[in-house]
Amino acid sequence: MGSSKLLSLALLLVLLTHANSASETSFNFTSFDTNKLILQGDASVSSKGQLLLTKVRGNGDPTVDSMGRAFYYAPIQIRDSTTGKLASFDTNFTFSIRPYSNNENSAFGLAFALVPVDSEPKRKDYFLGLFNKPDDPEAHIVAVVFDTSSNQIEIDMNSISPVARESCHFHKYNGEKVEVRITYDSSKKNLRASLVYLREQSATSSTSSVHMEKVLNDWVSVGFSATSGLYDPTSETHDVLSWSFSSKFSQHTTSERSNFLLNMFL
């Protein structure tokens, strides 16, 4: 076999290996590491390894008009441009939101979001650092919002007007640990978010049909964004305590990509 064919074969093997490894991404934070995160705005990691999305005072109380975002340091592929197929994903995290003096009128909440790579923070308040205007077709964002102003779980797509919502009385459980699971089934285009307050096992869920390919770029950043109220009685903390994430293209999609690469060299 000639040297050029050997080189081509070696390149093909590298590409096939990369194609298969790129089909799946997973990580797990039981304690957060700043080296594995992109921190924006007021977001920080505490000495205990907790992700603090908004600023807190020395005594742990929230500060007003604070906004922070935190994303996994590496981009995640959500769509394969070769096959047009989408990845499914599953993410689990725990968080707590504690209002100032246990006030029941705190704002504005926290969101799990898929945003464009290299995205910068946007407006505060109920925009949650994700949007600059109420409706923005060019935002390329899908978010699951835990809206403490309206006491509901929302699914947002390029807009602060939700495509799905479900009531959730956040202020009934001030400061308690919340466990969240969000799944996306790419074959059914189904996005589901479920929330459980661990102490009372009180559960809420919201589901919507989401065509990710119509909203998101092929590669995204995944993570969190939060904003706090404009004065003390409406301020609140937004702490993420743990986070795991996994995404995967179907085996059929991986095979299609491998066949495409093979055909390039035949």
Swiss-Prot record:
The keyword Transcription regulation does not apply. The keyword Signal applies. GO terms for biological process: defense response. Glycans are attached at residues 28, 92. CDD domains: lectin_legume_LecRK_Arcelin_ConA (cd06899). Transmembrane segments: none annotated. One of its GO terms (molecular function) is toxin activity. Keywords: Glycoprotein, Lectin, Plant defense, Seed storage protein, Signal, Storage protein, Toxin. It comes from the Eukaryota. InterPro entries: ConA-like_dom_sf, L-lectin, Lectin_LegA_CS, Lectin_legB_Mn/Ca_BS, Legume_lectin_dom, Leguminous_Lectin. It holds the Pfam family Lectin_legB. Residues 1-21 form the signal peptide. Seed storage. This carbohydrate-binding lectin has toxic effects on the important bean bruchid pests, Z.subfasciatus and A.obtectus. Belongs to the leguminous lectin family. This is Arcelin-4. It comes from Phaseolus vulgaris (Kidney bean). The gene is ARC4.
